[in-house]
Amino acid sequence: MKLIVLDRDGVINQDSDAFIKNVDEWIPLPGSIEAIARLCKAGWHVAVATNQSGLARGLFGIQDLSDMHFKMQQLVMDAGGRIDLIVHCPHAQADRCDCRKPLPGMYRTIASHFELEDLRGVPVVGDSHRDLHAGLMVGATPYLVRTGKGLRTLEGPLPPGTQVFDDLAAVVDHLLAGDA
């Protein structure tokens, strides 16, 4: 099975240090929706794993999050693709849960959903160290994009084996070229 795990904010949509709090603030990055659709058309399964501590902070509610995810899924479907699974961590860092990246709880949930022992070799695409480290903990292959917080992330050391691309579309170009 060909599976990819994507972070949301900064990879699929614009990110903000003030959080993405509602459907109007959820704006896709150029080429990201089409990139997901291209993966699907090539037989890939797509999962999204996203920290959403704005829920715990009271910045937005679960309905707001559902509306944002509905918009994302609808745009991907309109482009001819699909998102097979979206998992989110609603906790603040102080909650000390195991689902908040950089811990691998959400990635284990994804592996379980797809009946996989781990995510060995699965591309995990993120814009921050926490995305990459969470993926490494379950054997995934880290891909960093320069969108979102990606340029800031490049200022520090990257996990071994991290591949760096301009954006999600460039990652997909690379993966699909390897499928040929």
Task: Describe the function of each predicted region.
Residues M1-A47:
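Active-site neighborhood of HAD-like aspartate-dependent phosphohydrolases
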Residues S32, I36-H69, I83-D95, G135:
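Substrate-recognition element of Asp-dependent hydrolases with the DxDx(T/V) motif
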Residues M72-M77, A111:
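Conserved hydrophobic residues forming the short capping helix/wall of the S-adenosyl-L-methionine
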Residues R100-L132:
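Conserved Lys-Pro-Asp/Glu-containing loop-to-beta segment of HAD-superfamily phosphomonoesterases
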Residues Q163-A170:
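Short acidic-hydrophobic, aromatic-tinged amphipathic segments that line or gate anion-handling sites
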